[in-house]
C-alpha cells in the first residue's frame, strides 16, 4: 500500500510540473520500432523520464539496444517500453512498470551491461516502482483503454517549452536552473558568441582592468604617502578608489584564469558538455563573486557617502572635524550594506560564472537576481547621490553669488566647484551607461534565449519553440561597453588626487625627504578664515576684515611691525640676537693674513649712510670681530633687561656695521 501511495505521489508531482510548464498532452500512437509488438499501441508524452516526444525517448534507449538484441532477458524490452513509452490508460493517466519486472531485467542483464559499459540509470532504480502482483498491466485494462477515443486527439502540435538537453544536465544537489528548468546549466563557451569574439572580449577586458588597476592603485598609494592630506569631506574618494581597485583586480584575475573557474569541465563519457558554473560548490568561483560583488556595491555606496560629506560641508556648514566624527557610521554603512547583500545571495545560491570575463557574478542568466540585486541598488545610489550633489553645488553657488569674498577665495571656490562637477560627471556617465546596458539586457534576454533555442533545438534533440515571432542575437559591442564602463568608473579618482602637490610628494618620497604638513587646497577652500566666516555669519551682519600685519599689496607697515616686535617674548629676542650674529659672521670673509672682511664690500657701501665709510679704518677692521662679539653680548643683555627696547629697522648687516663705525 505504501509503495502504491509513493508511486501515485511521484506521478502526480511529475504531471503537475509538466502542466505548469507546458501545454496539455494527449495519447499518441507508438512509433518506436522496439515497442511495436507489445500488447498496447498508444503512449503518453512526455514520459516519466522527461522525454518530450518519442524521438527523444528512442535516443535515450539506444544504449540498451545491444542487450535487447542479445536477449539477455525477455523482460528487458517490456520493461524499457513500459518506462520510455508508458501505456496510456486514460487521458492524463500513466501506469508504471512493476518492481518485479524491473528486478528480473536488472539481475539478468547486469553483467552484460557492465561488459558494454552501460550504467543502470538512477531513474530506473527498481525501488522506485510499485510492488505489483502482476509484473505488467493486464491485457484487459490495455484493450479497454488502449484505443484513442474521439475526444482524445492522437497528437497535437503544441508549445513544449524548454526541455533541458542531456548534455546540459547537472547534479541535482547543485540546485541550479536554466531557463526555468531545474538541474540544468547554460553551455560553455557563451551561448551567443563565437570563440574568436570571446577571445577578443577577454583581452579587451584584461587591458581595461590593468588601466583601472594602475589608476586606483596610484590613488591609494598617494594617500598612504601623506595620510593627513586627504581628510573629510574628501576622504571617501580614497575608499572609493580602493573598492574599484579590488574590482579591477578581480577582472584581471579572471582574464588570467580564462574560463577555468567560470565553466565546468566537459565529461564526454557521460555525455556531459561544458556548462556554466552555478551555485557555491566551486570555491574559487564563490571567492571571485564575493569580492567582485561586495566591492562593486561598496564603491557605489562610498560615492553616495562622498556626496553626503560634500552636502554636510556646503549646506549645514559642517567642519572637517564634525564630519570625521561620523566616520564610524559611514564605514558601517559602506561595508555593512554590501556585506548583507552578498550573504543573501550566497544563501540563495545565485552565483553564476561569466564565460566572457572569466569571473563570477550575479544576474548573468537570472533576470530576477539582476533586477533586485544589481539594478535596484545602483539606481538607488544614483538617485540619492545626484540629489545631494545638486543640493551642495547650489548652496556653494549661492555663497559665491550672495556673499562678498576676496578674489582669491572666489577663485578657489569656483575651482573647487568645477572639480566636484568634473569628478561627478566622470563617475555618473559610465555608471549610467552600465545601468542602461543592464536594462537593455533585461528587456531582450527572453528574445535572445528563444533565438538560441530555435538555432540549437535540433542539435540538442529538444523541442523547438512554437510560433516564434521575433528572433534576435545580442551584439558584442553591448557587452564590451558594459565591461568598459564598469571599470572606467574607478578611474576618476586619479583626477582628484592629480596635482602639482602630488608630484612633489612622489618626488620627495623617492628622494627620501620628509614632506612638511600642509592643507589640501580643496579642503582649504572650506576652511579659509574669511570664507568660513562668510559661511557661518548672519547674512544681515556686515563683514569686518581684520589686519594680519601685512597689507594686500604685501608691504610691511611700520606700526604693525613695531607692535609685533614689542609683544615678542624674551626668548624670541634672544634668538633674534643670535640670528644677527650668525648673519654677520656668514657675510664675512677671512683673508690670508687672518683678517675678516665683508664679502660684498661694494654692496655694503651702497647701503651705508653718507660718511660712514670714513670710520672703517684698518684698525677697526682688525678689531671688528672682537668688538662685534663684545657688543653683541652686551646688546643681548641690554635687550633682555629692557623688553620695550626700540627695534631699529634695516638689515642685520647694516645695524652691525653702523655700531662698529660709531664705536670707532
Swiss-Prot record:
InterPro entries: Frizzled/SFRP (IPR015526), Frizzled/Smoothened_7TM (IPR000539), Frizzled_dom (IPR020067), Frizzled_dom_sf (IPR036790), FZ3_CRD (IPR041769), GPCR_2-like_7TM (IPR017981). It is a multi-pass membrane protein. The chain crosses the membrane at residues 205-225, 237-257, 288-308, 328-348, 374-394, 420-440, 477-497. GO terms for molecular function: G protein-coupled receptor activity; protein serine/threonine kinase activity; Wnt receptor activity; Wnt-protein binding. The keyword Signal applies. Expression restricted to the early nervous system. Changing residue 501 to M: Complete loss of activity to induce the Wnt target gene Siamois expression. Its main location: membrane. Disulfide bonds join 27-88, 35-81, 72-109, 98-132, 102-126. It comes from the Eukaryota. Residues 17-204, 258-287, 349-373, 441-476 are extracellular. Keywords: Cell membrane, Developmental protein, Disulfide bond, G-protein coupled receptor, Glycoprotein, Membrane, Neurogenesis, Receptor, Signal, Transducer, Transmembrane, Transmembrane helix, Wnt signaling pathway. Residues 537-664 are annotated as: Disordered. One of its GO terms (biological process) is non-canonical Wnt signaling pathway. A motif (Lys-Thr-X-X-X-Trp motif, mediates interaction with the PDZ domain of Dvl family members) lies at residues 501-506. One of its GO terms (cellular component) is plasma membrane. Residues 549-564, 573-585 have a biased composition (Polar residues). The keyword Cell cycle does not apply. Residues 226-236, 309-327, 395-419, 498-664 are cytoplasmic. Residues 22-135 form the FZ domain. Pfam families: Frizzled (PF01534), Fz (PF01392). Coiled coil: none annotated. Glycans are attached at residues 41, 355. Belongs to the G-protein coupled receptor Fz/Smo family. Receptor for Wnt proteins. Most of frizzled receptors are coupled to the beta-catenin canonical signaling pathway, which leads to the activation of disheveled proteins, inhibition of GSK-3 kinase, nuclear accumulation of beta-catenin and activation of Wnt target genes. A second signaling pathway involving PKC and calcium fluxes has been seen for some family members, but it is not yet clear if it represents a distinct pathway or if it can be integrated in the canonical pathway, as PKC seems to be required for Wnt-mediated inactivation of GSK-3 kinase. This is Frizzled-3. The lineage of its organism: Eukaryota, Metazoa, Chordata, Craniata, Vertebrata.
Amino acid at each position: 500500500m505504501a509503495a502504491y501511495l509513493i508511486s501515485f505521489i511521484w506521478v502526480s508531482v511529475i504531471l503537475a510540473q509538466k502542466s505548469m510548464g507546458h501545454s496539455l498532452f494527449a495519447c499518441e500512437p507508438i512509433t518506436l520500432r522496439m515497442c511495436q509488438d507489445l500488447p498496447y499501441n498508444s503512449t503518453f508524452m512526455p514520459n516519466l523520464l522527461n522525454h518530450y516526444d518519442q524521438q527523444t525517448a528512442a535516443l535515450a534507449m539506444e544504449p540498451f539496444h545491444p542487450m535487447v538484441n542479445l536477449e539477455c532477458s525477455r523482460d528487458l524490452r517490456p520493461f524499457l517500453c513500459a518506462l520510455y513509452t508508458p501505456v496510456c490508460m486514460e487521458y492524463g493517466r500513466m501506469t508504471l512498470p512493476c518492481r518485479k519486472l524491473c528486478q528480473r531485467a536488472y539481475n539478468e542483464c547486469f553483467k552484460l551491461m557492465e561488459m558494454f559499459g552501460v550504467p543502470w540509470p538512477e531513474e530506473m532504480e527498481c525501488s522506485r516502482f510499485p510492488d505489483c502482483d502482476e509484473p505488467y498491466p493486464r491485457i484487459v485494462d490495455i484493450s479497454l483503454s488502449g484505443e484513442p477515443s474521439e475526444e482524445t486527439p492522437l497528437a497535437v502540435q503544441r508549445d513544449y517549452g524548454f526541455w533541458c538537453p542531456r548534455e546540459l544536465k547537472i547534479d541535482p544537489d547543485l540546485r541550479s536552473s536554466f531557463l526555468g528548468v531545474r538541474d540544468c546549466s547554460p553551455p560553455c563557451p557563451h551561448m551567443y558568441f563565437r570563440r574568436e569574439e570571446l577571445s577578443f572580449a577577454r583581452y579587451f577586458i584584461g587591458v581595461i582592468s590593468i588601466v583601472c588597476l594602475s589608476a586606483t592603485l596610484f590613488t591609494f598609494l598617494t594617500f598612504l604617502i601623506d595620510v593627513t592630506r586627504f581628510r573629510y569631506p574628501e576622504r571617501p574618494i580614497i575608499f572609493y578608489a580602493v573598492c574599484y581597485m579590488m574590482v579591477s583586480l578581480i577582472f584581471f584575475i579572471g582574464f588570467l584564469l580564462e574560463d577555468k573557474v567560470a565553466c565546468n569541465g566537459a565529461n564526454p563519457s557521460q555525455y556531459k558538455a561544458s556548462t556554466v558554473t552555478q551555485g557555491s560548490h566551486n570555491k574559487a568561483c564563490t571567492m571571485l563573486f564575493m569580492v567582485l560583488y561586495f566591492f562593486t556595491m561598496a564603491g557605489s555606496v562610498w560615492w553616495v557617502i562622498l556626496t553626503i560629506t560634500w552636502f554636510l560641508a556646503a549646506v549645514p556648514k559642517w567642519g572637517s572635524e564634525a564630519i570625521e566624527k561620523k566616520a564610524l557610521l559611514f564605514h558601517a554603512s559602506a561595508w555593512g550594506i554590501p556585506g548583507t547583500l552578498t550573504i543573501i545571495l550566497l544563501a540563495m545560491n545565485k552565483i553564476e560564472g561569466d564565460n566572457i570575463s572569466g569571473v563570477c557574478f550575479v544576474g548573468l542568466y537570472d533576470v530576477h537576481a539582476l533586477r533586485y540585486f544589481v539594478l535596484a541598488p545602483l539606481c538607488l545610489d544614483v538617485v540619492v547621490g545626484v540629489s545631494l550633489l545638486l543640493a551642495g553645488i547650489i548652496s556653494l553657488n549661492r555663497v559665491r553669488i550672495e556673499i562678498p569674498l576676496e578674489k582669491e577665495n572666489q577663485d578657489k571656490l569656483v575651482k573647487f566647484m568645477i572639480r566636484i562637477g568634473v569628478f561627478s560627471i566622470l563617475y555618473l556617465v559610465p555608471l549610467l551607461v552600465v545601468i542602461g546596458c543592464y536594462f537593455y539586457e533585461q528587456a531582450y534576454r527572453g528574445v535572445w534565449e528563444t533565438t538560441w533555442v530555435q538555432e540549437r533545438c535540433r542539435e540538442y534533440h529538444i523541442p523547438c519553440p512554437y510560433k516564434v515571432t521575433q528572433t534576435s542575437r545580442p551584439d558584442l559591442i553591448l557587452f564590451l561597453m558594459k565591461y568598459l564602463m564598469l571599470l572606467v568608473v574607478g578611474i576618476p579618482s586619479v583626477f582628484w588626487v592629480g596635482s602639482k602637490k602630488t608630484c612633489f610628494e612622489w618626488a620627495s618620497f623617492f628622494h627620501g625627504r620628509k614632506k612638511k604638513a600642509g592643507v589640501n587646497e580643496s579642503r582649504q577652500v572650506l576652511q579659509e578664515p574669511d570664507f568660513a566666516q562668510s559661511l557661518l555669519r548672519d547674512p544681515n551682519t556686515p563683514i569686518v576684515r581684520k589686519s594680519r600685519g601685512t597689507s594686500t599689496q604685501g608691504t610691511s607697515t611700520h606700526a604693525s611691525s613695531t607692535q609685533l616686535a614689542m609683544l615678542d617674548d624674551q626668548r624670541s629676542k634672544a634668538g633674534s640676537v643670535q640670528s644677527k650674529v650668525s648673519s654677520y659672521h656668514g657675510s664675512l670673509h677671512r683673508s690670508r693674513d687672518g683678517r675678516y672682511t665683508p664679502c660684498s664690500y661694494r654692496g655694503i657701501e651702497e647701503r651705508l649712510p653718507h660718511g660712514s665709510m670714513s670710520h672703517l679704518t684698518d684698525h677697526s677692521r682688525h678689531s671688528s670681530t672682537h668688538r662685534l662679539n663684545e657688543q653683541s653680548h652686551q646688546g643681548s643683555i641690554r635687550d633682555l633687561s629692557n623688553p620695550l627696547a626700540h627695534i631699529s629697522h634695516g638689515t642685520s648687516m647694516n645695524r652691525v656695521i653702523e655700531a662698529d663705525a660709531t664705536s670707532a
